[in-house]
Amino acid sequence: MRRAAVITDAPAFLEAIKPVVEANLAEISDDASERSGEGWSGTMTCGACPVQIEGDVDGMRFHFRARGSAWSFSVGKTDEDAVRASFQAVPDGWMTDGWAEGDGDFSGSWMPHSEAWRHITESITAWRAVRVGGAL
């Protein structure tokens, strides 16, 4: 069985990985940290590991999170409900999810911001269609 490495010098470890992290962040930071559209606005609260965006849509709150190789988008009346709706039923809550487009186990954690915003706009469209259909 392979044993996990033990980090004995945290500052040296952080200095060693800094160029890789900075390069990854530069590559994925291909869009704005805030965006809005008709009836919605969002702000990126974390740029990587996980990519996380929160905002308002039609008087509700939404939460987007991409981590590992997957992403989720959820809506609720409050911030807490929006987060909880991604893993349990909440009143007036809704969620959808999918897989990140990149290769590898961490394609969601390092998701390009343009991809995240596209998933958000597509999810808002899907949520609105469900609301109009009366399923909520």
Predicted stretch roles:
Residues 2-136:
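Cysteine-centric segments in proteins
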